Swiss-Prot record:
GO terms for biological process: hydrogen peroxide catabolic process. Heme b binds at residue 87. This is Hemoglobin subunit alpha. The modification N6-succinyllysine is found at residues 7, 11, 16, 40. It comes from Loris tardigradus (Slender loris). The modification Phosphoserine is found at residues 3, 35, 49, 102, 124, 131, 138. Residues 1-141 form the Globin domain. GO terms for cellular component: blood microparticle; haptoglobin-hemoglobin complex; hemoglobin complex. Coiled coil: none annotated.
């Protein structure tokens, strides 16, 4: 459960991401594909090379979903319901992959905003991404 301090940390951190959200989303995906090659199996139709337009487009989708989650932090299940349905019923993404992408997002944010990535912010973002992952896997039944 996100505390009021966690919510403030997440919102403040995401505001600093600003217009770079899509870029960071793509970078995190690229980092995930390189670090955890098995994740590529969900994207057989993508050009996964560095700078790929498809990876950039999907990175923007990831970032947009996270922006929605930040904006609706008190009601993520409703805000992310359609995305949860998509991942559970159509895409059938193994839930462990959300943890892998979350880790890569944290690394990406830490690389771009090292001064702002304090232990408290790190912990808050980690809890937030875990909450998003829980929502996205909630319909896996």
């Amino acid at each position: 459960v996100l505390s009021p301090a966690d919510k403030t940390n997440v919102k403040t951190a995401w505001e600093k991401v600003g217009g770079h959200a899509g870029e960071y989303g793509a970078e995190a995906l690229e980092r995930m594909f390189l670090s955890f090659p098995t994740t590529k199996t969900y994207f057989p139709h993508f050009d996964l090379s560095h700078g790929s337009a498809q990876v950039k487009a999907h990175g923007k989708k990831v970032a947009d979903a996270l922006t929605t989650a930040v904006s609706h932090v008190d009601d993520m299940p409703s805000a992310l319901s359609a995305l949860s349905d998509l991942h559970a019923h159509k895409l059938r993404v193994d839930p462990v992959n959300f943890k892998l992408l979350s880790h890569c997002l944290l690394v990406t944010l830490a690389c771009h905003h090292p001064a702002d990535f304090t232990p408290a912010v790190h912990a808050s973002l980690d809890k937030f991404l875990a909450s998003v992952s829980t929502v996205l896997t909630s319909k896996y039944r």
